[in-house]
Amino acid sequence: MKDPYDVIKRHYVTEKAKTLEGLSLGNGEGKKKGSYCKHPKYTFIVDSNATKPLIAQALESIYADKKVKVKSVNTICVKPQPARMFRGKRKGKTAGFKKAVVTFYEGHSIG
């Protein structure tokens, strides 16, 4: 197995990702966005060659002290987007990446 920190690059923090985490808490955050769910969901940026079982193993080994169990992993490949740099004079692209939405079993959390 690869080093878990090579598979999981970092936690992905956006408004939508925080809403997914808030829906599992049942504390009123994100109430308008959707229904509450029993299983917490967290979003990570992962290696582009990582598979779903490899992502699950890496997360369980990184958070072994919290004894989390991964229920499911959904992956999304984000394509590079056109971007303008230097006041619109140069055109380029943003970097593409792969993100994983990980669902833990009920009662398991990393936060």
Curated annotation (Swiss-Prot):
SUPFAM superfamilies: Ribosomal proteins S24e, L23 and L15e. Gene3D superfamilies: 3.30.70.330. GO terms for molecular function: rRNA binding; structural constituent of ribosome. InterPro entries: Nucleotide-bd_a/b_plait_sf, Ribosomal_uL23-like, Ribosomal_uL23/eL15/eS24_sf. It comes from the Bacteria. Keywords: Ribonucleoprotein, Ribosomal protein, RNA-binding, rRNA-binding. One of its GO terms (biological process) is translation. Disulfide bonds: none annotated. The keyword rRNA-binding applies. HAMAP family: Ribosomal_uL23_B. One of the early assembly proteins it binds 23S rRNA. One of the proteins that surrounds the polypeptide exit tunnel on the outside of the ribosome. Forms the main docking site for trigger factor binding to the ribosome. Part of the 50S ribosomal subunit. Contacts protein L29, and trigger factor when it is bound to the ribosome. This is Large ribosomal subunit protein uL23. It comes from Chlamydia abortus (strain DSM 27085 / S26/3). The gene is rplW.
